[in-house]
């Protein structure tokens, strides 16, 4: 089940790596944290899919430490992100599903819990958040917060899910208009201009659905050569009952969703769109690095 669980890709870099030419505070090195949304092990490092094109993650992995057995605290955004930033497990906080998002994450974490950005701020770092970090409620935690950039809705409307809403599509626009591209650009500008110890936390939204990226990323994965992962029969049977419920509610496995995709011939299109989004995300990570 590891390959089905999205994770937050966390990249830490000391200031000596990415603040070249600037005076370092050796006691307080700058830290870069990149959160990539819903990216499983489909990359050229963990090799969850043999055709994933992710040269930037691969380049970074060769310079650092790869935690190949790391799993996020929860397979849903609302509980997973606060768990990362507070160190409090969902099983302890009670923030266990996306339905928990009806209340702010602080309700579950408690009023006195100190988050990672607050801890840095209290100890001499400037903390800057860009785009999606906490899944709502970012503003009070960072000294400076830049909200997610919206992508203009210029779509070719070619990929619909079974409810006729866009779950994948081709963005009919330059890559520079994509929200994640703008977030990466804001991160680059911050790195280039900031002086002194810095915690910079950047959120990259793709490959979260909808898988909408420009045509060039789809072209990297020709449908006729695309491989589908082997489907494991009764793959959910060994899960605890609670996780079976999560799978049914969140991933729609309990509703025969995958069977419908296969029957309608959409499975390869979905794999292609996800991989295209993965490569797009990898490119934004590479620009920041």
Residue ranges and their predicted role:
Residues 45-81, 87-88, 92, 124-128, ...:
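Short, structured active-site-proximal loop/turn typified by the sulfatase FGly-forming signature C/S-X-P-X-R
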Residues 6-16:
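Bacterial N-terminal signal peptides
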Residues 21-23:
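Boundary at the C-terminal end of the N-terminal hydrophobic targeting segment
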Residues 27-31, 63-68, 123-127, 195-200:
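Loop/turn elements at helix/coil->beta-strand transitions in domains of secreted/extracellular proteins
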Residues 26-29, 38-51, 149-182, 189-289:
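Active-site-proximal cap/lid insertion segments
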Residues 83-176, 215:
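Catalytic-site neighborhoods of secreted/periplasmic enzymes
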Residues 1-4:
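Positively charged n-region of N-terminal signal peptides that target proteins for export
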């Amino acid at each position: 089940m590891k390959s089905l669980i999205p994770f937050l890709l966390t990249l830490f870099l000391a200031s000596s790596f990415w603040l070249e030419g600037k005076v370092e505070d050796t006691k307080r090195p700058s830290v870069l944290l990149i959160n990539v949304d819903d990216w499983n092990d489909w990359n050229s490092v963990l090799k969850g899919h043999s055709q994933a094109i992710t040269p930037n993650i691969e380049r970074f992995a060769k310079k650092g430490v790869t935690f190949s057995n790391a799993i996020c605290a929860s397979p849903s955004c609302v509980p997973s992100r606060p768990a990362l930033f507070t160190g409090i497990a969902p099983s302890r906080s009670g923030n266990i599903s996306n339905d928990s998002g009806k209340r702010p994450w602080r309700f579950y974490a408690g009023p006195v819990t100190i988050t990672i950005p607050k801890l840095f701020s209290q100890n001499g770092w400037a903390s800057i958040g860009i785009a999606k970090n906490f899944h709502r409620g970012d503003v009070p935690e960072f000294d400076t917060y830049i909200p997610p950039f919206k992508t203009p809705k210029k779509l070719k409307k070619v990929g619909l899910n079974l409810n006729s809403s866009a779950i994948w599509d081709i963005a009919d626009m330059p890559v520079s208009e994509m929200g994640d591209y703008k977030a990466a650009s804001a991160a680059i500008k911050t790195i280039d201009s900031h002086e002194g110890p810095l915690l910079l936390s950047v959120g990259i939204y793709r490959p979260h659905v909808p898988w909408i990226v420009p045509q060039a990323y789809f072209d990297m994965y020709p449908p006729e050569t695309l491989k589908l992962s082997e489907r494991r029969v009764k793959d959910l049977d060994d899960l605890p009952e609670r996780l079976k419920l999560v799978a049914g509610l969140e991933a729609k496995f309990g509703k025969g969703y995958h069977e419908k995709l296969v029957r309608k011939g959409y499975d390869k299109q979905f794999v292609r769109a996800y991989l295209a989004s993965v490569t797009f995300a990898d490119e934004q990570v590479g620009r920041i690095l």
